[in-house]
């Protein structure tokens, strides 16, 4: 009930993100072989319950160790009731969508295209590259064209849009700000992992194309999210600039020495590096 209440509140909130914190108990209801509580014990995290601990735990939770996967009658009843509720909700939403589609055929066709997962159509001949320009400047030229031609694209940067040159995209749109979501650029602040999570979440929802930029060395902060995105094969775009071993006055803290090897070794992540 508390989870449902939190989700309902989150869905009603239209102006700001909602953080739901679920406090759990490790090994809830588990008992050791001697019958003492196994709750909140570190061992339950990495090892399965076995022997008498397994038997005691199943009994403690109201089940039969000889037939542990039986679904309780009250659970069956709860799920059956919820299934009927969901059928009604789905029918109402499908009817509402059908009415909307009938009244908005052009928008409906556009929505279908955006949610199809197909690559957007881009006229790359519109990209103008200057000879000898830095790779991040070349990226900015491409992003500017994408901002103009891909209306469902969102680009983000971790407080570095003027340096990683994702501002090539920003200059053709405006930032998303509180109370105004009409822009297509998300200024994430110094929060690389959060930025990655949000862009990946957008891609999982569907309907948008998400890309984000920061210095290559800061890919370290994003690594857990990048790895999961790669394993899940989510086509989100990571733009990492300043990828040379020497990055001038910023010094060793900003020099990506080992990051390239880490990223190239990551399974299912496609790497494209423009270098001479």
Language model segments and positions:
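Thiamine diphosphate
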Residues: 76-276
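Glycine-rich ThDP/TPP pyrophosphate-binding loop and its adjacent helix/strand module
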Residues: 1-81, 251, 259, 265-276
């Amino acid at each position: 009930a508390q989870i449902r209440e939190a989700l309902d509140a989150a869905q009603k909130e239209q102006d700001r993100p909602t953080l739901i914190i679920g406090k759990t108990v490790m090994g809830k209801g588990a008992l050791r072989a001697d019958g003492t509580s196994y709750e909140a014990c570190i061992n339950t995290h990495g090892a399965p319950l076995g022997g008498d601990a397994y038997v005691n735990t199943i009994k403690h939770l109201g089940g039969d160790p000889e037939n542990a996967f039986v679904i309780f009658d009250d659970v069956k009843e709860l799920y059956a009731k919820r299934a009927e509720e969901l059928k009604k909700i789905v029918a109402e939403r499908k009817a509402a969508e059908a009415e909307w589609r009938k009244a908005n055929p052009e928008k409906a066709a556009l929505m279908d295209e955006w949610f199809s997962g197909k690559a957007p159509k881009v006229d790359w001949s519109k990209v103008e590259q200057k000879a000898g320009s830095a790779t991040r400047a070349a990226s900015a030229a491409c992003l500017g064209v994408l901002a103009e031609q891909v209306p469902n694209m969102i680009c983000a940067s971790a407080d570095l849009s003027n340096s990683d040159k994702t501002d090539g995209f920003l200059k053709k749109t405006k930032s998303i700000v509180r109370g105004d979501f009409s822009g297509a650029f998300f200024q994430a602040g110094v929060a690389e992992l959060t930025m990655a999570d949000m862009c990946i979440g957008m891609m999982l929802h569907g309907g948008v194309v998400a890309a984000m930029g920061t210095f290559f060395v800061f890919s370290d902060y994003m690594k857990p999210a990048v790895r999961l995105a790669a394993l899940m094969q989510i086509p989100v775009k990571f733009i990492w600039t300043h990828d040379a071993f020497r990055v001038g006055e910023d010094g060793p803290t900003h020099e990506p020495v080992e990051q390239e090897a880490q990223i190239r070794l990551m399974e299912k992540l496609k790497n494209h590096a423009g270098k001479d």
